């Protein structure tokens, strides 16, 4: 069985992205394989592709940091989900000691493809009344805002937070977090 994936072998614009075929791999013991139904497009991916992200991939590299789909294989240590579950995946949550998305996780866990293998701890069950498209696009803005507001700034209940511009998805997510 073949899997179409998107990868790139050098930094640049969208023209560096290429669709290649590879064999479908089996997940390792703590991973799941997802039949990708939808994926999110993110500014972080553009920055990664253009060479402006805090981490740089090892080439050739896969790409894609959020997706939704249906689990079709699970590793031997995975008990939190089962084959057939509809899930969201956010595999870019594999961090290094500086809390940056690691080059290894970028190369290994990109979700642009027919299937994607991701660590089981980076998936969440899809909300039943959400479409796959909605589920794939609902994560990064909130995680970006949470990282800045909660993880890095330690904002707590009753703290004051001012948004000088709230038109981006991350700012809208941030406003919902601090309510």
Where are these predicted regions, by residue range?
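Glycine-rich beta-strand-centered segment in the early N-terminal region that forms part
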Residues: 23-40, 52-96, 109-110, 130
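Mid-domain Rossmann-like dinucleotide-binding core that forms the NAD(H)/NADP(H) cofactor-binding site
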Residues: 135-179
